[in-house]
């Protein structure tokens, strides 16, 4: 009789071995790269920062030492980086290779999940150089207009709503461009300039920057991996400040205020695991008029210090 295998998770709920859900994570990495390449290629020019971003994706990839497919991918990425330009032929060759790996490598593209991974990769690509040109905005609008199912759900619906407002008068001013860039970076977790990482940092959906939130009697829910200590340590801080710790965001709960604290490092699959689901739930409840706040780890640490 064969024993059923179980994934070994650390205390943050993250898999301790790469074998856990390997095919799904491999497909995610490939779909994300497809989106990144589309995003970077949108303006036909590879800037210095975009080159750094693409190289960071390659160097941070957890599969590169053991997987032949990723060795091939890395070689083609290096060819693209060599002259600083992504030509149409290079893009077609690269995208075809990535699609072949998905098709013939017995990998699932995830359906809707795969579409979102591609979108997040695209958002990372167009925001890698910390600017948005008209060509990139136009291509984003076209991408969102292609899939009604995609834009009916978070996070694409949030981008579509903001983009429609910006494009309503046919003019994108500097303020609107900056606003859209901030939203894109928040959703994709883009933090290359701050961290040097192509992925892995949390998307920041903070709903408040208020530095004086009284935690006494409040219900606090944590998600993500924290740079300032384990989740258990964060929960102990919350309890010491008179808050109630909740494991999930529950609609039926009689919530006055629930503070969802985002850890600074997210799971490889954050948008499809409890991390992303909790964010989606809170944003949905806020649209329904519920008084729920989301704060990031930086603000959480300031609150605990302040209230101590």
Q: Where are each of the predicted segments found?
A:
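Amphipathic alpha-helical protein-interaction segments
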Residues: 2-194, 212-220, 256
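General N-terminal targeting signals
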Residues: 63, 103, 149, 189, ...
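Short secondary-structure transition/capping segments
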Residues: 95-97, 118, 160-164, 201-203, ...
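Intrinsically disordered, low-complexity Ser/Thr-rich linker and spacer segments
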Residues: 104-110, 204, 305-307
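Non-catalytic propeptide/linker segments at domain boundaries
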Residues: 193-207
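Interaction modules related to DNA damage response and DNA replication/repair
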Residues: 209-308
């Amino acid at each position: 009789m064969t024993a059923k295998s179980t994934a070994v998770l650390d205390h943050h709920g993250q898999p301790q071995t790469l074998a856990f859900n390997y095919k799904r994570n491999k497909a995610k990495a490939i779909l994300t790269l497809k989106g990144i390449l589309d995003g970077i290629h949108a303006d036909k020019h590879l800037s210095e920062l975009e080159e750094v971003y693409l190289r960071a994706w390659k160097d941070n990839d957890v599969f590169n030492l053991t997987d032949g497919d990723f060795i091939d991918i890395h070689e083609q990425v290096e060819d693209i980086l060599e002259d600083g330009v992504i030509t149409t032929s290079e893009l077609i060759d690269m995208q075809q290779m990535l699609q072949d790996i998905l098709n013939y490598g017995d990998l699932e593209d995830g359906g809707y999940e795969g579409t979102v991974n591609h979108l997040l990769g695209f958002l990372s690509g167009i925001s890698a150089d910390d600017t948005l040109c008209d060509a990139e905005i136009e291509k984003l609008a076209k991408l969102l207009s292609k899939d009604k199912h995609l834009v009916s759900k978070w996070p694409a619906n949030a981008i579509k709503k903001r983009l429609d407002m910006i494009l309503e008068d046919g003019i994108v001013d500097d303020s609107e461009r900056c606003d859209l860039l901030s939203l894109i970076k928040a959703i994709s977790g883009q933090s290359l300039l701050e961290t040097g990482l192509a992925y892995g940092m949390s998307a920041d959906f903070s709903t408040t920057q208020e530095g004086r939130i009284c935690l006494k009697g409040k219900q606090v829910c944590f998600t993500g991996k924290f740079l300032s200590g384990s989740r258990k340590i964060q929960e102990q801080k919350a309890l010491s400040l008179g808050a109630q710790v909740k494991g999930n965001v529950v609609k039926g709960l009689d919530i006055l205020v629930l503070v969802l604290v985002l850890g600074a490092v997210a799971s490889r699959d954050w948008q499809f695991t409890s991390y992303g689901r909790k964010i989606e739930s809170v944003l949905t409840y806020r649209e329904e008029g519920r008084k729920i706040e989301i704060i990031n780890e930086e603000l959480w640490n300031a609150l605990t210090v302040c209230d101590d």
